Amino acid sequence: MTTYLVQEDTYNTNNLDFKIRRVPESFSTFVIDFKAFFGVRPQHVSRRFSISLSDLSYQPKIYNPRADWAVTAAFTSFEALQASTLDPVQRFATIGTGSGTDAIAALDVFPHLRSIVMTDLHDEVVDKAKINLMSAAEKADGRVRTVARDATGLSGHSLVPLKGQEPFDLIYENLPNIPLPDDADLLDGQTSSTYFDCSDVSGVVPSFVSKALLDLHYVCLLQARTFDLLTESGVVLSSMGGRVPIDTMLQLADAAGFTGRIPSMSWKVQSEPDSVIEGYATLQEKGLGPFYFYRVSTLRHVFGHLTGAEAGLHALEIENELLPDRLDAVMALKAHKQGIDIGHPVVVMASTRQ
């Protein structure tokens, strides 16, 4: 595997200078500095590691970590969970892993981790993710290297690939929200990172969940319970863009037979804004939602220097503080086209069985 390093650029996010090694976009291998990407020094994985991507992999936002889900949702929520629970996370699964950076985050945060399962829709995506996980553990201690080496990659929809597995202490999911347009193909590039085939869940999901475009998050909880995939104290972490009320998310958990809470909350720049915001705007005009976005300047001001865990403790207060400045999807699309940077809160819900 060849790595191409061309130059080193500096970005400023939340008053931290992030140095990212730039690689030509035509190549599919990158070198990531852990601190540059996640914002803190690694505890257990290698300080620098390479990642390889399939054409079908969700592209990590290495040039703008504030737009990356592994940074704003996975790593932040893992830290919050590790700090708030006495139950060690030993068995971990990530659903829709993409490049595998969420699994790398788990390997670094959870000191008792002994088993990782990564899933995605495509075999080649999870194959690359496994390679990336091993790269991140290359210079780590023996336990970490063994966990990475023995990690399992499975392909399939939602939690179906996990059926029959030994129960997990933690299942993390960050699944798409927008129904697949008639003229789109889930096998085309990164389409499956943004869209899902709503025919797969037709008739299963409560109407209030579908109206909020949270279908797959509900399905994951339902499958976790039906397939008996959680230990007695096991948790499902659902990573959701805060474009709908937090109360709707908590009601979703209850409808699936779980008790939900918000251990972590952050914000991110809207990635792929042309297609994503337009997708939400189109569906809002058809009667779904409404869906809300915010100017990046507003999000930066309201969240300030709060950690994910601190923001999670005050999630409803933050939501109320943002209300006067919210833009529905149609307004957000217009603002984006005017050159205004648009983002949204990132809400991670922890669900335990009732």
What are these model-predicted stretches?
Residues 179-187, 249-251, 273-276:
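Short aromatic-enriched loop/helix-cap "lid" or pocket-rim segments at secondary-structure transitions
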Residues 274-286:
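Short, surface-exposed amphipathic charged segments that create phosphate/polyanion-binding patches used
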Residues 68-183, 187:
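Conserved SAM/SAH cofactor-binding pocket of Class I
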Residues 4-112, 292-350:
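SAM-dependent Rossmann-like transferase core, predominantly class I methyltransferases
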Residues 208-268:
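Conserved Class I SAM-dependent methyltransferase catalytic core
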Residues 175, 351-354:
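C-terminal beta-strand of the catalytic ATP-binding
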Residues 172-219:
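Mobile active-site "lid"/loop adjacent to the S-adenosyl-L-methionine
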Residues 144-155, 261-274:
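A generic structural motif
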